[in-house]
Amino acid sequence: AKNIDVPFSDRYSISIINSEKFLKLPKYKALNLIKSFYNDTYAVDQNACSSPHLILWKGKLNSKAKKKFWLYLNNLVKYIYNPPLITSVDNYSRLVKDMIKNNNIHSYKRLNRSLYVVTLKKLHPNFFLKKTKWGFFYECNIQNLKNINYVTNRSLQTFTYFGFSKKFIKYFFKVNNFNGIDR
């Protein structure tokens, strides 16, 4: 029998969260959102094209929302995610390389060996070169949704969102004619 290789494009995905809407969620709904996020990322070790690597935060309460989001995710990850031990080395190595080579890093958090969050100062067109796995995420605050244009290109596969209406998102992307984004 012959093997047939099926090539997959090297794609990435991003998510945007409206911080005010996230903070208004009752705890059980916030936990459901976190579980959905977990399923999109950790269940496939962030290897799926639809797994977000960059989380964008929009709103005036970003710091408070981020703290709650990552805390809830960390609590879930600690109890149900069991990656290989190499995860610790890979994530730490990635962080060190980023700290040395990337002057766009504002700060970072290591919540556990499988949850690293690197906060970017601003969005950058070459972000798509930073595909991650095993619970290593980049995040960035954005003031204007049009800034998403900095990270849209043909490699962008999926754009997930919370706290914005589907109608608004469809209109926004149609009007701004961003590159990439299959779904």
Protein language model features and the residues they cover:
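NAD(P)-dependent aldehyde/semialdehyde dehydrogenase
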Residues: 35, 42-160, 167-183
